[in-house]
C-alpha cells in the first residue's frame, strides 16, 4: 500500500478533496467510481476507471482476485452490474491518501498514475478550485395523483389484513440537453450536492449507457448491508419529518415509530435466514439522525454469519431491502407491482463495493439514475422517492414527505 500525505481537516475539507479528485478524473477522460463519506473506515474511496458489466445476481461482487475492489449495484428491477478496479485511493481520517489494490505501486498501471495525478491536483487546488457546474435539469412534478391513489389502495389492503405497511415509490423525470456529456453532468450533479449537503455516505458509479447500464449518483443515507468478515449490520430507515421541524417529533409520532419497528422485525427475519442461530440482535433502536432535507428514524440490527457465506448469498437473503418493501415482504412486493405505474429500476436496490471479506452497500434511495432512451437516443435522468405507508397515513401527508425527501435532488444547488 502506498501513501501520499496531506493535512487533515473538517468533513467539508475531506469532501472537497474527494470531489475535486473525482472531477479531475472525469475531466481527464476517465470513468471513475467514488464512495464519499464513511465507507470501509475511510472518508472516501476513489477508483480511476471501473468498467461496469452486467452480471447474474449470484455472481455479484465476486472476483477470482482476493485483493480486488469491486464496485457495483443490484437494481430493484433489472440487471445487476459490477466492475473491478485495479487500484483505489483511500482518504483516511488523518488526511492521508492510501493506495490499495493489485495495481498499486505499478508505474505502468494507468489507473494508478491517474489516481496519483488527481490526488496531487486535489491536494493543491481543492480549497480554491470551483467544482464543475451541471446544466440545470427541468424536472417534472411527479405523478401526485397516482401516488395518492396508491396510498389509498395500501390503506385498504392494510384494513383487509393483506399487509401491515408498504413503501410506495414515485419517480421524477428530466432529460439531459443534447450537448451535455452524461458522465460529466452526473459527476457535476453529484459533486455539487455532496459538497452542499455533506451526506454521511454517497456513491457514484460510471455506468455504461450503451450497454444499458445506468450512471448512478446516490445521496442515500441508508446503510443496507455492512459486512466485515462474518459480522454484518443492517440499518433500516423508517420515519421522516422535514429538517425544519424539531427532531424529537419523530419519537412522539406513533405512525413513524410503528413504521420503524415493523421493518426492524422484517430485517431480523431476513438476516435470520442466513445468520448463525441466536446471533441476530437489535443493537440500536429508534435513533433520530439528520439526512439531506429531513430527519429520519434509524435502527440497527446485527448478526454473525457462517464463514463460507458469500456476499451474493447474503444479499440474496435480504433483497430487496426490508425498508423499501413492506410487511409481509412477498405480498407487499406483489401489491407494489400493481400500484406503482413504472418499474423502479435501480431505485430501492443496493449500491456500493466489496473488498475481500468486506462488503458495504447502501439502499439506492435519493439516487439520480442516468439512462439512454432507446427511441430518441437522449439521456434521461430519473429520481425515485418513496415512503412508508401505514394505516395512519394520509395521501396529502405522504406527498409532503415525498417533496421533502426530493428537494435536495430536484432543486438546483
Give names to the regions the model predicted.
Residues 1-413:
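Extended alpha-helical targeting/anchoring segments
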Amino acid at each position: 500500500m502506498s501513501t501520499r500525505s496531506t493535512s487533515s481537516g473538517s468533513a467539508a475539507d475531506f469532501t472537497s478533496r474527494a470531489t475535486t479528485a473525482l472531477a479531475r478524473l472525469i475531466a481527464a477522460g476517465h470513468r471513475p467510481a467514488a464512495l464519499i463519506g464513511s465507507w470501509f473506515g475511510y472518508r472516501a474511496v476513489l477508483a480511476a476507471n471501473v468498467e461496469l458489466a452486467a452480471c447474474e445476481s449470484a455472481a455479484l461482487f465476486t472476483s477470482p482476485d482476493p485483493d480486488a475492489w469491486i464496485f457495483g449495484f443490484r437494481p430493484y428491477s433489472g440487471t445487476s452490474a459490477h466492475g473491478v478496479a485495479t487500484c483505489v485511493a483511500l482518504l483516511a481520517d488523518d488526511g492521508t491518501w492510501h493506495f490499495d489494490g493489485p495495481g498499486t505501486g505499478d508505474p505502468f498501471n494507468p489507473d494508478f498514475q491517474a489516481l496519483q495525478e488527481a490526488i496531487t491536483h486535489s491536494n493543491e487546488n481543492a480549497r480554491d478550485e470551483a467544482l464543475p457546474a451541471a446544466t440545470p435539469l427541468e424536472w417534472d412534478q411527479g405523478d401526485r395523483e397516482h401516488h395518492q391513489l396508491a396510498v389509498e389502495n395500501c390503506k385498504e389492503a392494510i384494513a383487509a389484513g393483506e399487509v401491515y405497511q408498504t413503501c410506495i415509490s414515485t419517480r421524477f423525470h428530466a432529460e439531459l440537453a443534447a450537448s451535455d456529456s452524461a458522465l460529466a453532468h452526473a459527476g457535476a450533479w453529484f459533486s455539487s450536492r455532496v459538497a452542499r449537503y455533506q451526506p454521511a455516505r454517497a456513491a457514484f458509479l460510471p455506468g455504461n449507457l450503451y450497454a444499458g447500464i445506468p450512471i448512478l449518483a446516490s445521496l442515500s443515507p441508508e446503510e443496507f448491508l455492512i459486512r466485515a468478515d462474518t459480522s454484518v449490520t443492517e440499518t433500516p430507515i423508517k420515519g421522516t419529518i422535514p429538517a425544519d421541524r424539531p427532531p424529537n417529533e419523530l419519537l412522539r409520532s406513533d405512525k413513524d415509530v410503528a413504521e420503524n419497528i415493523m421493518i426492524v422485525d422484517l430485517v431480523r427475519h431476513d438476516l435470520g435466514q442466513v445468520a448463525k442461530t441466536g446471533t441476530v440482535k437489535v443493537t440500536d433502536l429508534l435513533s433520530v439522525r439528520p439526512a439531506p432535507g429531513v430527519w429520519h428514524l434509524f435502527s440497527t440490527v446485527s448478526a454473525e454469519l457462517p464463514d463460507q457465506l458469500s456476499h451474493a448469498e447474503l444479499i440474496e437473503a435480504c433483497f430487496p431491502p426490508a425498508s423499501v418493501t413492506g410487511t409481509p415482504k412477498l405480498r407487499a412486493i406483489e401489491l407494489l407491482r400493481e400500484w406503482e405505474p413504472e418499474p423502479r429500476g435501480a431505485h430501492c436496490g443496493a449500491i456500493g463495493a466489496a473488498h475481500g471479506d468486506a462488503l458495504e452497500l447502501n439502499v439506492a434511495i435519493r439516487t439520480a439514475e442516468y439512462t439512454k432512451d432507446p427511441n430518441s437516443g437522449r439521456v434521461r435522468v430519473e429520481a425515485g422517492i418513496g415512503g412508508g405507508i401505514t394505516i395512519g397515513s394520509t395521501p396529502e401527508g405522504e406527498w409532503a414527505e415525498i417533496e421533502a425527501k426530493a428537494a435536495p435532488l430536484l432543486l438546483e444547488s
